[in-house]
UniProtKB/Swiss-Prot annotation:
Annotated binding of Mn(2+) 1, by residue: 9, 11, 42, 198
Location of the protein in the cell: Cell inner membrane
Entry's cofactor comment: Binds 2 Mn(2+) ions per subunit in a binuclear metal center.
Record's protein name: UDP-2,3-diacylglucosamine hydrolase
Signal peptide positions on this chain: none
Pathway(s) served: Glycolipid biosynthesis; lipid IV(A) biosynthesis; lipid IV(A) from (3R)-3-hydroxytetradecanoyl-[acyl-carrier-protein] and UDP-N-acetyl-alpha-D-glucosamine: step 4/6
Keywords assigned by UniProt, alphabetized: Cell inner membrane, Cell membrane, Hydrolase, Lipid A biosynthesis, Lipid biosynthesis, Lipid metabolism, Manganese, Membrane, Metal-binding
Source organism: Haemophilus influenzae (strain 86-028NP)
Annotated catalysed reactions: UDP-2-N,3-O-bis[(3R)-3-hydroxytetradecanoyl]-alpha-D-glucosamine + H2O = 2-N,3-O-bis[(3R)-3-hydroxytetradecanoyl]-alpha-D-glucosaminyl 1-phosphate + UMP + 2 H(+)
Length: 237
């Protein structure tokens, strides 16, 4: 039966090879069987520009390119850790870059896709930070810096983010229910798929269904499968 996959929040990095191993297994064994693959952000733990090169980056690029070359339509939506992924990465992998909110039709279902961080409006400090780093002039300036400098800046930002999370409540870091409902209504859909919060779940709400993709962990890959009958669910070992 025809089907597609949705994943997010893998946070791939050299420091967690077990996550890379899960991704390799998925891309070699499951992904080639799909019609479409949607990666909804935070594929990498951080991204400092398309000009960065490493064995991990090349391995990930090659895996995606291989799946794309086998006829799978691959899509990428930016996360809060890899929002600087650009056209060079897209060209190298064959993915199509998606905007912050993307409306798709899949197996006769209208679906709204987003990474999920834009729905967490109660986290005002993060939203201010997000608006700042998404300014195009600031991104261009950052990308002009030497790679070594960018790495230092990215590591400091990541450390500050991890520190800030310790002081924030779980409620603040989750989606705002009213705002999320407004977005669903704005795009006139009854199915929303997002990641970011690392709280894998399928929420059947009154007016719509909200599917939250989970983060990938040492022994678990959060993979949502949707088939042509319209059925969907997370793959369980």
């Amino acid at each position: 039966m025809k089907h597609s996959y949705f994943i997010s929040d893998l946070h791939l990095s050299e420091t967690q090879p077990e996550l890379t191993a899960l991704f390799v297994d998925f891309m070699q064994n499951l992904a080639p069987q799909a019609e479409r693959l949607y990666i909804l952000g935070d594929l990498f733990d951080f991204w400092i520009g398309d000009d960065e090169q490493s064995a991990l980056i090349q391995q990930v690029k090659d895996l995606i390119k291989s799946v794309s070359n086998q006829g799978v339509q691959c899509y990428f939506q930016h996360g809060n850790r890899d929002f600087l992924i650009g056209e060079r990465f897209a060209k190298d992998t064959g993915v199509q870059l998606l905007p912050d909110y993307q409306l798709i039709t899949l197996y006769d279902k209208k679906i709204l896709l987003c990474h999920g961080d834009t729905l967490c409006i109660d986290d005002e400090a993060y939203q201010q930070f997000r608006r700042r780093v998404h300014q195009k002039w600031l991104q261009r300036l950052f990308l002009c810096l030497p790679l070594k400098v960018r790495v230092i800046i990215a590591e400091k930002i990541r450390a500050k983010s991890n520190q800030d999370k310790q002081a924030k409540s779980q409620e603040i870091m989750d989606v705002n229910q009213a705002f999320t409902a407004e977005k669903v209504q704005e795009f006139d859909v009854n199915l929303l798929i997002h990641g970011h919060t690392h709280r894998e779940a399928i929420h059947q709400q009154e007016e719509f269904t909200r599917i939250v993709l989970g983060d990938w962990r040492k022994n678990y890959a959060s993979i949502l499968k949707m088939d042509e009958s319209g059925e969907f669910g997370f793959i369980k070992d």
